[in-house]
Structure formats: C-alpha cells, structure tokens
Amino acid sequence: MTTTGPAALLARLTSPGAPAFAVLHRRTPRLAPDTVEVLLGTVGSHDTLADLPVRTGLPADGPRHDLLALVPYRQIRERGFEAHDDATPLQALAVEEQYAFPLADLLAALPQQPVRLEGGGFDIDDEEYAGIVRRVIEDEIGNGEGANFVIRRDFRARLDGFTTGTALTLLRRLLEQERGAYWTFLVHTGDRVLVGASPEVHVRQSGGTVVMNPISGTYRYPAGGSDLDSLLAFLHDPKELEELTMVVDEELKMMCTVGDLGGQVLGPRLKEMAHLAHTEYELRGRTSLDVREVLKETMFAATVTGSPVQNATRVIKRYEHGGRGYYSGALALIGRGASGGQQLDSPICIRTADVDPATGELVVRVGATLVRHSDPYSEVAETHAKAAGVLAAIGARPGPARSGGTVDGGGGAAGGGARRLADDHRVQAALDARRAGLAP
C-alpha cells in the first residue's frame, strides 16, 4: 500500500485518461474496520474462470490484491446450466496500484454533486410481476420443478450528465445511508460502472478455509422504521422460515463440494440494513481447491437463483426475457497472503446499479424469492424494498426511515448508540428455534 492521500487520488480518477479503478468498503475478517481500499489497473476480458490470470508465489511487499473479477450470471453455463447469453463479459481488473484509507478520510474527499435522474421505472409493472409470481407458484413449484425460485425485474432510468464524479457521489450516498452491507463498492472499467451495496458473501477463501453466507427471508421495515413486534412476526412466519431453510440446504450441497475437508454451520443470525433486514447462516469448510475452482463450483447462490439450482436456471430462462448481466453473479477479489497462499473475497452482485458511462443509462436488477406460500403482492413489495437502498442513492426513492430500535451497526458512515433489535432476547430465542429444524 502506498501513502497517496484520498483527495489527490480522487482528482486523478476524475481526470481525462484515468485508469480503470475500484473503490471497496469490505466487511472481512482480514481488514481493519472502516477501511476503504482503492485499486487501479487495466481491464481484460476472459472466456472462462479458469482463464483468470491468478498469480502464485510470495508477494514482494506482503499481502496484496492481484485481480478483481466481474463474473456475469451467464458464466453459470460453465457448469452446464442454462442461461440467456447476453454477452456480458467476464472481466478482470489486474491490480497495478492499491491504496487504503480510513473511511472518514475518503468520505471527506468524495464529491457531493447533483444527481439528475431522467425517467425511471420498472420494466415489468407491479401487476404483471404479481402475475408472474402466480404462474411460477402454480406451474413450476406446484408441479414439483423446485422448492423456490428467484425471478427478477429491472428498474431502468437515465442519469443526465453522468461522469465519474456522479459515480463517486452515488458511492458516497451509499456509504452514508446504507448499513449492514458486506461490500459497498464502485467499479469503473472504462465502459461499465457498477456501484452498489451487497449484503451477501458469495464465497470467501483464505488459509484453506472457505466461507459461504446464505441470506434469505426479508423483513421490510414499517413506514416508521423497524419495531420489535413486527420483527418477531417476521421471524415466526412459516413462509420466511421456509425460504431460508431451502437455500441453506442447497448451499450446503455446494459447501460439500468445495469444503472437501469438512465444515460446519453457524447461525441463524439477523442482518439489519437501512431499509430491511434479512436472516442468514454462515457455512464454513476446509478446502484444497484453487480459488477459480471454488468460484466455478459455487455459481451461483440459491438465494439469487432458487433450488435446486440447475432446475432454477431453467425456470429463470423461461420467465425472464433477457440476460441478467452481472446481477446474481459475483465480484471476486483475488490475491495472496504473506506466505503466498491464495485469498478470495467475493460478494454476490445484488443491490447494484449497472451504468453505461457513455449514455448514463442505468439498470438496477432485483428479484424476490418465490415459495409455495408466497403472496404475489408481498413479493412485489419485496422487490421495491430490495431496490430501495440504491434507488435512494440515485434520488429515485426517499432515504431510509430511522428507528430507535436499530443502530447503524458500522455499515453506514453515521454511527449510533441505540441497541439493535437483534440483541433482544426474544429475537435471539426466535432465531435459536430456527436452528432446531436443522439436522444435527
């Protein structure tokens, strides 16, 4: 890591001829809290995950990042599964420079420019999406094609006068407004911009340990903010319990493949964010596999496809009329530890705005998890809630309501001292009761 200050670096990134770059705020055990990393380099495209140029050997100056890969959903065809081919490229930023700053210092340097939004709306309206939900429940789940499926819809708009400064402004807003995100990030490849706040680990690997983090079940905060009664009702809702149980079961299958040396299940836990909360588990295993093989065998999480995953890809292809781009794919930060061992940190690419920097055209893709007990209009509301964080950042939705029952929890820049609802003993008891349903 070098010592260039954040203001000078951001001035460089907003100048003509700036290199491709990424700004990452990651919640990972290997990184000091409230650290933001900035990576600069060159971008290349690759056909398969095996083609990613993963480096080996001892790094010269201690642990370092070598590569940031953008893995599109269409890459799931490497596993023999179906997907619309929308030609979204598997790209990788080869890291040539890397910097780390305290979050507060970076926020002080990030721009606060006006964001001008033109148009804006879902490509599939609420009634049409509710109709799709009904058909999937009746024709797919009802006929035994699978236990749950995630069907997306797209919010599309245009950011007038879009520049790199606009992208950095959106990142600033997400850092300030969102909480509980695993990664809050901006990636600018030159011809594509991704800016988002993903709550969910796709897969993490270090020192032979591999971690997955299935998240499912969505508690949408009431208009006045979260409260204990509505949270407990959510935790005791059979539909929400069913969602989480099914995706954990599916991702345990993946863990049995990549965690070839054994593993364990931790949780469930509550993940509180700005507009909603989720229930989650953590799966841990020991692996002997290369990071590229781990990425391949975990394409893609049941939480963003469905279960069984292979059947889910067929249902997705039937009900979604085009490709998913990077939605439900992954970002993958690959590097080496001080001893030369492989390191991987990969979030699922959700809650993300995908922007064409040449035109300002923007798409935010979101989906709801459909199970046999799903209510179509509740699933419509779930897509609105999942999009809310990014849409608030671009000015298409109001910012989050704050509640005395939750605290920032370290996700957003503005901290707080209030007690989290997850710390209440009744919430913990409800979460513990869910674990009783897992096989020992």
What is each residue range found by the language model?
Residues V23-A32, L70-I76, V187-D191, L333:
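Short, flexible beta-strand-to-coil junctions
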Residues R286-G405, G417-L431:
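Conserved hydrophobic core element of enzyme catalytic domains
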